[in-house]
A protein has these predicted regions:
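The feature marks proteins involved in alpha-glucan
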Residues: 1-18, 37-115, 120-125, 136
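Short proline/glycine-enriched turn/loop motifs at strand-loop junctions of beta-rich domains
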Residues: 22-29, 58
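Short beta-strand elements bearing conserved aromatic residues within extracellular beta-rich modules
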Residues: 29-31, 63
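Short acidic, flexible loop segments centered on an aromatic residue
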Residues: 33-35
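Substrate-binding/active-site clefts of carbohydrate-active enzymes
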Residues: 104-108, 117-255, 263-290, 295
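A glycine-rich phosphate-binding loop feature that marks nucleotide/adenosyl-phosphate handling sites
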Residues: 298
């Protein structure tokens, strides 16, 4: 197994930000910082088709990647898309003051799950607008809420199954900080939080991974919603890296208690070690490190 930095822009304790992009077809990649002034920084190849740069880029800095001197693209592993799926990506700081240190999760036998859509559950359609309703859900006997997919999609309202930025909670819902506040509040009310994730296809608009890393997709399989994700062909190790690190980030950075995997019948993998098995193994390793249960279900 290879060891790579986390994908995307990672703001670090020393005030620098590490940028890592999987762009296996590119011969040259530059990081283009748009704030506070336009700056172009060459990225270095680090193997496996990945490119890396470390520079000063505080939270809020907007950026793109420039491939082979001409094509400027957002970050497929962006944590924030403040101007939508076609706009620049933005650096975020994952630091958050949590209050759920004593949280031990909910036992499997005690789960009573309420599925909700963030955009339609309240008139405001945001993560934080859900918080006042948590006591009501708890008093109904609910022990966990399941959020329909929140990964950034085109526009402001969507069922969530057209997501194209797997690492970015949708901006109109409240983004990174809004989701963390919701999870923290849910745990304070004794409610677990599950997240619906889509690892079988990407949405049709704003999927720049197709252009930046063509091996992420395969024509050997078909889904009804878009190109199948390459989990077992050439360079599929990098695809697994992108997807599995995404799952682990929801658990680690957002304190999500488990993931509901959408349409697992469309996650095609004929390799000896199926990606779902690998995902389950890595999630359980993460649960042991976190000291609380983490569930996967479909």
């Amino acid at each position: 197994m290879f060891h790579l930095p986390l994908p995307g822009a990672i703001y670090r304790a020393d005030g620098t930000t590490a940028f890592t992009l999987w762009a296996p077809s590119a011969h040259r990649v530059e990081l283009v910082l748009l704030d506070p002034m336009l700056q172009t920084i060459p990225m270095q190849p680090i193997g496996y088709g990945c490119w890396h740069a470390v520079t000063t880029a505080p939270p809020g800095t907007r950026y793109r990647y420039r491939l082979d001197g001409s094509r400027e693209r957002p970050d497929p592993a962006s944590r924030c898309q403040p101007e939508g799926v076609h706009g620049p990506s933005a650096v975020i700081d994952h630091h958050f003051v949590w209050h759920d240190e004593a949280w031990q999760g909910v036992a499997l036998a005690d789960l009573v799950i309420y599925e909700l859509h963030v955009g339609t559950f309240t008139p405001e359609g945001t993560f934080e607008a859900i918080i006042p309703y948590l006591p009501l859900l708890r008093d109904l006997g609910i022990t966990a809420i399941e959020l329909m997919p929140v990964a950034h999609f085109p526009g402001v309202r969507n069922w969530g199954y057209d997501g194209v930025y797997l690492y970015a909670p949708h901006t109109t819902y409240g983004g990174v900080r809004g989701l963390k506040r919701l999870v923290d509040a849910a745990h304070a009310h004794g409610l677990a939080v599950f997240l619906d994730v889509v690892y079988n296809h990407f949405g049709p608009e704003g999927n720049y991974l197709w252009d930046i890393a063509p091996p992420a997709f395969t024509d050997r399989y078909r889904t009804p919603w878009g190109a199948a994700i390459n989990y077992d062909g050439p360079e599929s190790d990098l695809v697994r890296w992108l997807i599995i690190e995404n799952a682990l980030e929801w658990l680690r950075e957002y304190h999500i208690d488990g993931l509901r995997l959408d349409a697992t019948h469309a996650i095609f993998d004929m390799s000896p070690y199926h990606v779902l098995e690998e995902l389950a193994d890595r999630v359980q390793e993460q649960a042991l490190r976190l000291g609380r249960p983490a569930y996967l279900f479909a």
